[in-house]
Amino acid sequence: MSRILVLYHSLWGHVEQMAEAEAEGARSVSGIQVDVRRVPETMPAETLAAVHAKTHQAAPEAHPDDLANYDGIIFGTPTRFGNMTGQMRNFLDRTGNLWQEGRLVGKVGSVFVSTATQHGGQETTLTSFHTFLFHQGMLVVGVPYSCTELMNMDEISGGTPYGASTMSKGDGSRQPSANELTIARFQGRHVAEITRKLFG
């Protein structure tokens, strides 16, 4: 049985919702075990309170060494100035031993993101995150246009061929749309199907 990890960082819960949709899509593929984990929060408690962060999230925290236990990993992060969050960056920077030992080489990797605005850096965050996957020797998977929701022009929506995405609005009031969650489920299923083909 192939194993997939959905690993995310979420401040207001938007990426958390997308992570659950990714996991739902992956679980729809038979012969796949899916775990959802989050990276440790590094922001001080008083700062989290000041920005009204969602501090209670069901997913347990992950350790960098956990990544080697999976055949596919789907990463999710909010965007900070066109890049992943510092919390996710801190977590990934602790995977040097995995890189030295080649323990992620040949595994499947994919990414989804959340931004505050429609043009808030979704694609730059996705593609810059891919650099980490390439350095680890992972096989990068996006969202093909067979996911017809990518072509939806009836509403403002996230979703790119590089990975699923959503928008939170500056105050966090906008929640992931049905279209965005459908794309996330598609991505999760797509990653799971490829992982199963590679690892059984």
UniProtKB/Swiss-Prot annotation:
EC number, as in UniProt: 1.6.5.2
Keywords attached to this entry: Flavoprotein, FMN, NAD, NADP, Nucleotide-binding, Oxidoreductase
SUPFAM superfamilies linked: Flavoproteins
Gene3D superfamilies in alphabetical order: 3.40.50.360
Cofactor note as given: Binds 1 FMN per monomer.
KW Transport (keyword) present: no
Catalytic class of the enzyme: oxidoreductase
Binding-site list for substrate: W99
Residues engaged in binding NAD(+): W12
Catalytic activity: a quinone + NADH + H(+) = a quinol + NAD(+); a quinone + NADPH + H(+) = a quinol + NADP(+)
Binding site for FMN: 10-15, 79-81, 114-120, 135
Listed InterPro entries: Flavodoxin/NO_synth, Flavoprotein-like_sf, Flavoprotein_WrbA-like, FMN_Rdtase-like_dom, NQO
Domain Flavodoxin-like: 4-191
Cystine residue pairs: none
Cofactor section: FMN
GO cellular component, one term: membrane
GO molecular function: flavin adenine dinucleotide binding; FMN binding; NAD binding; NADH:ubiquinone reductase (non-electrogenic) activity; NADP binding; NADPH dehydrogenase (quinone) activity
Stored NCBIfam families: flav_wrbA, PRK03767.1
UniProt similarity note: Belongs to the WrbA family.
Protein name: NAD(P)H dehydrogenase (quinone)
Native species: Acidithiobacillus ferrooxidans (strain ATCC 23270 / DSM 14882 / CIP 104768 / NCIMB 8455) (Ferrobacillus ferrooxidans (strain ATCC 23270))
